Amino acid sequence: LTDDHKSLLLNIAPGTYQLQIYAENIGRITYGPEILDNSKGLFGAISLNGAAIENWKMIPLLVRETSVNELTFGDKKEGDSPCFHKGTFEMNTPKDCHISIKGWGMGELWVNGEYLGAYWEENATQSVEVPASVLKQGKNEVVLFELKNNSQRSVSLSDKPVYK
C-alpha cells in the first residue's frame, strides 16, 4: 500500500485466516511545509468487504534486537517479502571491509550475529561497513532482513565503500 493506493484486494477462498501487515516508517520529512503532515502507518477504519475489523492489534517489529542465531531459514519464493536471507563467505585474513547491497532494496544486515546497520537503495552509499573485529578467519555468516527485493540472492565484499 502507498499514499496513492490505499486498498488491497485479496482473492481467497472462504475460511479463517490471519492477516499480517508490515508498515515501514523510514523516510520522515524533516523540512518544508510537508513536515506538518508526516504521519506513518495505518489510518482510518480497517475493513473487510465494507465491515470494520475490530479488536486488531499493532505490535512493533523490533528486528534490530533480533538474535539472528535463533532464526530458522527455509526456501523463499519470489514475492516473499519481507524476509530474512542467510549466506556465508570465506575470509583468509579478517580486515575492515564493506558489503555491497547493490541490487537489494531496504533492510538490515548482520555478520556473525552482530548487527551492523540498515541499508536502503535510495541512499548514496550502497554498502555496509564491516569492521575486522566482527570477522573470523574462514567461514563468516551474513544475514539480511530484506523488505523490498526478494529476488536478489548475493552480496559482494569490497575494500572501499560502494556508492551509486
Question: Where are the regions that the model predicts?
Answer:
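Edge strands and adjacent loops of beta-rich recognition modules
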Residues: 60-85
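Terminal leader/tail segments of proteins
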Residues: 128-164
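Solvent-exposed loop and beta-edge segments used for protein-protein assembly and interaction
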Residues: 2, 11-15, 38, 78-83, ...
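A structural detector for beta-sheet-dominated domains
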Residues: 11-13, 22, 49, 92, ...
